[in-house]
A protein has these predicted regions:
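NAD(P)+-binding Rossmann beta1-loop-alpha1 motif at the extreme N-terminus of oxidoreductases
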Residues: 1-53, 60-63, 90
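Hydrophobic anchor at the start of a short beta-strand
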Residues: 4, 27, 127-129, 173
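Fold-independent oxyanion-binding glycine-rich loops
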Residues: 9, 32, 64, 79, ...
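Electropositive phosphate-/nucleotide-binding environments in soluble metabolic enzymes
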Residues: 10, 14, 30, 34, ...
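Rossmann-like NAD(P)(H) cofactor-binding subdomain of soluble oxidoreductases
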Residues: 55, 61-70, 74-146, 162
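Internal alpha-helical scaffold of NAD(P)-dependent oxidoreductase catalytic cores
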Residues: 83, 94, 119, 123-127, ...
Length: 230
């Protein structure tokens, strides 16, 4: 059993916290607003971000960041990209020494325009942050619907620890050393998804959808290589 703190009380952070708890870990969610954390604790619900889901009694909720991360062996960053740098700055002097840090957010830091693991690594003063990304809706993970993601890091031992921490029969975690490729894929796929949705909304057919997907994937791969991915 590992002591885990999930930074972020959004839908994705909550779904992953429930998964980690189910896997036998001691899990605490940190959220920035004490009133809402109190409401979640009392009602065992997260109506703003993960409606219709009951939070397990064993899932801890905390608005004091120092208390939430105290003695944590793993810290999971489930922070919206536009708040990413601000929360990392708050966390920097509270992060337990030697803990594993996992970024599960998608996108780029709004302020620096850099990848999120790179932003976290710099602001937290640590060498390696694991990226966990893939096609994964929070509401489906919370309901135990089969899901596959990728954990990426240059530190093979660390990424294997994270794979073991998150994996179960319904949540498959693959591993990679291509952190850049995994993060870029997780962020840019949303642009492609929007384009396909626009095509559908305009009433275009399967031909247009297929063209957008195939050419979009090719462009994603080329961009990934240019930016240093494998």
């Amino acid at each position: 059993m590992s002591k885990v703190c999930v930074i972020g009380d959004g839908g994705w952070g909550t779904a992953l916290a429930m998964l980690l708890l189910e896997n036998g870990n001691d899990v605490t969610i940190w959220g920035p607003f004490a009133d809402y954390i109190d409401e979640m604790r009392e009602t065992r619900k997260n109506p703003r971000y993960l409606a219709g889901v009951t939070l397990p009694d064993a899932l801890k909720l905390e608005a004091d960041m120092a208390k939430a991360v105290a003695e944590a062996e793993v810290v999971v960053l489930a922070i919206p990209s536009h708040f990413y740098d601000k929360i990392c700055v708050q966390l920097a002097d509270k992060l337990p020494k030697g803990c594993d840090v996992v970024s599960v957010s998608k996108g780029f830091c709004e302020k620096t325009r850099k990848r999120l693991t790179r932003t976290a690594s710099k602001l937290l003063g640590i060498e390696d942050v694991v990226a966990l990304s893939g096609p994964s809706h929070a509401e489906e993970v919370s309901r135990g619907i089969p899901t596959a993601v990728v954990a990426a890091s240059n530190d093979v031992e660390r990424v294997l620890r994270i794979q073991k921490l998150f994996s179960n029969k319904r949540f498959r975690v693959y591993t990679s050393t291509d952190t850049i490729g995994v993060e870029l894929g997780g962020a840019i796929k949303n642009v492609l998804a929007l384009a396909v949705g626009m095509s559908d909304g305009l009433g275009f057919g399967d031909n247009s959808r297929a063209a957008l997907i195939t050419r979009g994937l090719a462009e994603m791969a080329r961009l990934g290589c240019v930016l240093g991915g494998n």
